[in-house]
């Protein structure tokens, strides 16, 4: 793990077949579901309980289709769990990233998902505040 980045990183190196990439994706799903269900809650100043890490991990769960697609590519896959900068191809420390076309498609897909999650979170918070 890079000392500059304290968040957990998982390396999936060159899957040899579709079966191994499916196994890797299954591991990622179980890992993220476990993290999501065991997230700690944080008390806000207004007294309501908000789960910051649960929201972050739910966004990570929405990224799983892209993780699965990238695990099928015969390149090293560098997957940060709590940070989007590698998916947006902004990290210069990544040695081997997917081809530019795959990278741009993944970036666009993740950006759309991130905006959708942000809009959904905003809408749900407005519904909760009205009640």
UniProtKB/Swiss-Prot annotation:
Swiss-Prot/TrEMBL keywords: Membrane, Transmembrane, Transmembrane helix
Major localisation: membrane
Subcellular compartments: Membrane
Membrane protein topology class: Multi-pass membrane protein
Gene Ontology cellular component annotations, sorted alphabetically: membrane
Listed transmembrane segments: 61-81, 102-122
Note: Partially overlaps FIG4.
Name under which the protein is recorded: Putative uncharacterized protein YNL324W
Taxonomic path: Eukaryota, Fungi, Dikarya, Ascomycota, Saccharomycotina
